[in-house]
Regions:
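Class I SAM-dependent methyltransferase SAM-binding "motif I" and its flanking Rossmann-like core
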Residues: 148-196
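Glycine-rich N-terminal segment of FAD-binding domains in flavoprotein oxidoreductases
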Residues: 39, 43-63
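N-terminal glycine-/serine-/threonine-rich phosphate-binding loop
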Residues: 1-47
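Short, conserved loop/helix-junction motifs that constitute active-site signature segments
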Residues: 65-73, 102-103, 167-168, 196-201, ...
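Glycine-rich beta-strand-to-loop/alpha-helix junction loops that act as flexible
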Residues: 49-54, 144-148, 209
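Ligand-binding beta-strand-loop-alpha-helix segment within the catalytic cores
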Residues: 2-11, 70-143
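ATP/nucleoside-binding phosphotransfer catalytic cores, i.e., glycine-rich phosphate-binding loops
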Residues: 2, 194-196, 200-247
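A glycine- and small-aliphatic-rich helix-loop capping segment at beta-alpha/alpha-beta transitions
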Residues: 61-69, 92-96, 157-166
Length: 247
């Protein structure tokens, strides 16, 4: 039987392999400790999170941990260009699954502030979102996800402006991504933090469950590749990244 590939820690990359039953609870505890330390050091903490279904269980584990949530600012890594009240809004998902229980006191920084249509054009939304992120301050913890296609945030392979969004010399905080066609499961224009902004975080976490994404992760582990955007996060040496992998 062929041996299953398994990543190993290296440089600024740390691999935590835990059971699928405990991953979200253990990662939530790690995040909460980092936020509490930031509050102790600076008087506030910034948590930047991704949307989609993958982080829901993590959010629900995190929201019941006792820290001073009134001093936590929650920002978004990316957003669909829909009103913040829309069922597919990442902000709404965060409000529903994270900003409940003890975490209800946290402050959510919207990427798309509008509550109804029509919204400004995506480039204008990205510009406003970038200003809001800068006002919120540096993320102490930034939670990424990875799709089976290797995308992270709204940095999708095939986007016509992907190389610009991944360029560390790019001074934009957020960008409107040009996706043709848009993702089938959520066919909306997207705005996203650029790679440079993502890497400005003090600590990045990437939780992965299941084995279906391991082949993509293995490719990303080897070298930076525009076809696998998450590879640019894994290949850099600027920012600590913790991969939380369910065994």
């Amino acid at each position: 039987m062929a041996q299953t590939w398994h990543p190993e820690s290296r440089g600024t990359l740390t691999v935590h392999t835990v059971s699928s039953a405990t991953l979200n609870v253990r990662l939530a505890q790690d995040i909460a400790q980092r936020l509490a330390a930031a509050i102790q050091a600076r008087g506030f903490a910034v948590l930047s999170v991704s949307g989609g279904k993958s982080p829901v269980a993590l959010f629900e584990a995190l929201r019941v941990i006792a820290i001073d949530w009134s001093r936590v600012r929650v920002t978004l890594v990316d957003e669909r260009c829909v009103p913040r009240t829309h069922p597919d809004s990442n902000a709404r998902l965060v409000q529903t699954h994270l900003l409940q229980d003890l975490a209800a006191q946290a402050q959510l920084v919207f990427m798309v502030a509008g509550a109804s249509e029509p919204l400004p054009a995506p480039p204008l939304l990205a510009q406003a979102a970038g200003m809001a992120l800068l006002a919120a301050n540096t993320a102490d913890v930034l939670v990424l996800g990875m799709g089976a296609d290797g995308h992270t945030a709204s940095l999708f392979p095939g986007a016509s402006n992907l190389a610009e969004a991944l360029d560390l010399c790019n001074t934009q905080t957020c960008m409107a991504m040009v996706l043709t066609p848009p993702p089938a499961n959520a066919p909306y224009p997207r705005i996203t933090q650029t790679l440079a902004q993502i890497l400005s975080a003090r600590h990045i976490v990437l939780p992965l469950t299941g084995t279906d994404k391991l082949p993509t992760l293995q490719q990303a582990w080897g070298a930076a590749n525009l076809a696998i955007p998450i590879s640019f996060v894994l290949q850099q040496t600027q920012t600590p990244v913790a991969l939380w992998l369910a065994n």
